[in-house]
Amino acid sequence: MLIPVLLFIVGLLCLIKGGDWFVDGATGIARRFHVPELLIGATVVSIGTTLPEVMVSTTSALTGHGEIAYGNAIGSVICNAALIAAITIAVRPGKVDPKSLRTPVAFFFVAAAFYAGVAYTTGSFTRPVGLILLAMFVAYIVCNVLAMKNAPTPEEEEQAEEGPFAKELGLLAIGAVLIAVGADLLVDNGTLIAQALGVPESVIALTFVALGTSLPELVTAITSLAKGHGALSLGNVIGANVFNLVLVSGVSVTLAPFSIPQNSTIAGMNASLVMDIPVMFAVMLLLTLPALIKGKLSRPQGIALLCIYAAFCAVQFSI
C-alpha cells in the first residue's frame, strides 16, 4: 500500500507543475496570435488536459474493461461540469461572452444526444459509432480554427509583452506530458488503493477514475484562476467535455467496441440510463444555459452544481 500512495503523490505533483506550465504556454500563444482565451481553452488546452481520458479509456477498452471506458467518459463530463467548473464559478463568478460559448456548447449537446441515442436504443457502441464520433471531433476542431481566424483582436492583448515562441511551445508540450504522466500515476495507483478498500469497478469508473483523469482540468482551472484567466478555465472545461464524448469515446470505441455496463441497477433499471446520462445532461444545462442567456455565471449556480456532484457520488457508492 505504501508504494501506490507514494506514486499517487508523485502523480499529483506532476499534475500541479504540468498544469502551471501548460497554462503559461497556452495563454502565451493566445496573446501572440491575438486569439480570445476562451477559444484557446476550448481547443489547445482541452486537448492537452483530455490526454489522460484518452489513454485510460483506450487502454481499458483494449484490455476488455469497456465499462471503465464508458464510465470514464460520462463520469469525466459530470466531474468537469459539476466539480471543476463549479469550483471556478463559486470562487470567481463573473461575465462571459455568449458568442464564444455557442460553438463548444452546440457541439457538446449534439454529441451528447447522439451518444445517449446509442445508449438508449442499442446499448452497443460499435466501430461505426466510434467513427461518427471522431468525425464530430474533426468538425469541432475545424469550426474552432475558423472562429480563431475570424476572432477580433483585443487591445489589451496587442499591448501584452510576448515571450519567445519556442519557450511557449515548450511549456505547452512539457506541461501536457507531465499532466498525462501524472494522471496515469494517479489513476493506476489510486485504483489499486480503491480496490484494496473494496470499491467496485463500476463505481471506480464513474467516480474515482473519472475524478483522477479530470484532475488536469481541475489543476488547470485552479491555476488559471490564480493567474486571472477565468475565461480560459471555463473554455477548457466545456471543450474538454466535448472531447470526452467525441475524441475519448471515439478513439476507444473505434479500437475496441463495447456495450454499456449492466452490473448496476436502480429500481430494477440500468443505472447508467436512469441516472448517469440524465445527470450528465442536467449539469451541462445548468452550467451553460445561464452563460448563453444572461452572459454571466453566479456563485449560487456553482454551489448548486457542487451539491449535485456530491449527491451523484453518494448515490454511486450506495447502489
Regions found by a protein language model. Give the residues of each.
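Hydrophobic alpha-helical segments, chiefly the membrane-spanning helices
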Residues: 1-319
